[in-house]
Amino acid sequence: MKQYLDLLDRVLTEGIEKGDRTGTGTISVFGHQMRFNLDEGFPCLTTKKLHLKSIIYELLWFLKGDTNVKYLQDHGVRIWNEWADETGDLGHIYGYQWRSWPTYDGGFIDQISEAVDAIKHNPDSRRIIVSAWNVGDLDHMNLPPCHAFFQFYVANGRLSLQLYQRSADIFLGVPFNIASYALLLQMMAQVTGLQAGDFIHTLGDAHIYLNHLEQVKLQLSREPRPLPQMKINPDVKNIFDFQFKDFELVNYDPHPHIAGKVAV
């Protein structure tokens, strides 16, 4: 994935050292975009091994509208534990906003269902957007959304998705985000009868934490390998019916995992 390695190299070369909320310190650039054509393979990083199980279960968790870590923990996924309260809840984060965005009159909007409907029945719309950045609800989130909103685009029988990510932890978070939204694009394309097109990833504050610099340099020393393919159960026609068993990543041959501490 040259696009990702180019981002790492750019931040190492051009990045400005800044403080941050966690006290760890970063080097960062502001504004970067990567494009992944899913015809060329599934964009799962090969210069270090990713924990695909966590990526899939997290996405299914979002789509369920769930905001409690119990579902994740029941499936051996612990990536949200640091931000959960004593009951396991995370407040009104991604799943809540995607599926139950509150309206002024006491109702709720299921943004995912509305996006599916728009792709099917109004594909030329420029309003097929799902947002997790609810300004009026930020104080009710244990962690405000880093990947803030995404938009769908339909052309020539292909569905593309562009994500805006306000805050991008390049070493740990961004590889997960790329794979997660590429998978969401494939799922949405399948249930709307389209081919998966491009995933475009637009970053705001793109940063490397100072305690990840050596890991990043190690990753840049590794030669990328061919991308794998993601196979999805073709019988699933409803976006909310997918289960973990419906996904198979084939021909994934990554370099070994590189550990890094999460900045909380």
From Swiss-Prot:
Protein name: Thymidylate synthase
This protein's GO CC annotations: cytosol
Subunit structure: Homodimer.
InterPro entries: Thymidate_synth/dCMP_Mease, Thymidate_synth/dCMP_Mease_dom, Thymidate_synth/dCMP_Mease_sf, Thymidylate_synthase, Thymidylate_synthase_AS
Keyword check for rRNA processing: no
Hydrolase in keyword set: no
Main location: cytoplasm
EC number: 2.1.1.45
Catalysed reaction, written as an equation: dUMP + (6R)-5,10-methylene-5,6,7,8-tetrahydrofolate = 7,8-dihydrofolate + dTMP
Residues that hold dUMP according to the record: R21, R126, R127, R166, S167, A168, D169, N177, H207, I208, Y209
One Pfam family cited in the UniProt record for this chain: Thymidylat_synt
Active site annotation, chain numbering: C146 (nucleophile)
Function text: Catalyzes the reductive methylation of 2'-deoxyuridine-5'-monophosphate (dUMP) to 2'-deoxythymidine-5'-monophosphate (dTMP) while utilizing 5,10-methylenetetrahydrofolate (mTHF) as the methyl donor and reductant in the reaction, yielding dihydrofolate (DHF) as a by-product. This enzymatic reaction provides an intracellular de novo source of dTMP, an essential precursor for DNA biosynthesis.
Pathway(s) annotated for this protein in UniProt: Pyrimidine metabolism; dTTP biosynthesis
Coiled-coil parts of chain: none
GO BP: dTMP biosynthetic process; dTTP biosynthetic process; methylation
Binding site for (6R)-5,10-methylene-5,6,7,8-tetrahydrofolate: H51, D169, A263
Entry similarity comment: Belongs to the thymidylate synthase family. Bacterial-type ThyA subfamily.
Signal sequence segment: none
Swiss-Prot/TrEMBL keywords: Cytoplasm, Methyltransferase, Nucleotide biosynthesis, Transferase
Class of enzymatic activity (EC top level): transferase
Domain of life assignment: Bacteria
Any one GO molecular function term: thymidylate synthase activity
Subcellular location: Cytoplasm
